[in-house]
């Protein structure tokens, strides 16, 4: 026996960190010069009497593969596309699913839908992406996409936004694969109509449409958005009411449905006048002006607003159908850039706000308190990049500035934590140490999609930046 073995990371995270380990025996092997030795453990039997030859061939191929990668000029997009394949897993029924993160996350609806375009449609895996998207559509129940999937089929439907992210994922598939419009009409359009019918008709638990067409979600005891941490039995970031990204996602869903209804000849699903009115209402409700400029409130509730500066406002600019008027983009981006942007992603709360947590550390409760209270999330860079491109009057200059800012994420972090991958989160304060899962699906996916967008917008600037980043320059 080996007694009192300690696990330092578990101790840091406030978990049980000591155990006794049984040692059943030992292997003694006499080494002979020039003769290989293999110590092999597997859950499957080797289908040959010469198992050592099989293992040797596997080893040789893997060595060649790694040496080839080290010597290649693989692009950052190509690298992230390859890393993204790790998150695509087979379910027991043979279908594809997305694992949210390694080592301890399962398959979640929201994470899957946000990660799917970067993992598949923009990574050369269109069939895999279509498979996952159609599978999610078949799991819709009363307008809701499951938030957490379980092996026994008893999925959890405890989110207000997963279904709205489904609409966004369909939009991304159509953008990347315009030849799939027929498939969208046949398989996705009925799902979108089901979602809109239930959300707009007040048929979804904890979701109620108001007279102006926006959605109120939850109550003080619920956590139905992506900022869903709970500590000591209460939501850490209460966002009941009308969270800004829910309003933006809902408007985007209605506007996309309006365009599909026009294309498919279904006028009963057109909402052009309602959409025009909603844009005006949105601005009046969420626009905040203070001594540091203008931005969007995080939540509108009972006629008042939560004025803390958070990154969720970006979705009012970045979605395919933005609910915010274009002339307001620059003000929002200026505030987000000054308060939230870091080299590794966006903070979830401005450092000047009460409740800001600079470090993600301590036991489970302490870490949950920091999870969305300043902690940096790389996946938000996708929305930030889209917003930057939408607002830019000098596209090459804006792309150059953003690439220069986030260079450490690609030039340094890919060699840290989960080597080659992108972590789930980082500390809010410098040096922004990585934390959480060492490889997170939507971090990898949205970073890949961001690079794709920036390369497409300014190919010369991007090529120069990538070449310099490989050499260790700026």
Language-model regions, residue ranges each:
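Acidic, mature catalytic/reactive cores of soluble proteins
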Residues: 1-474
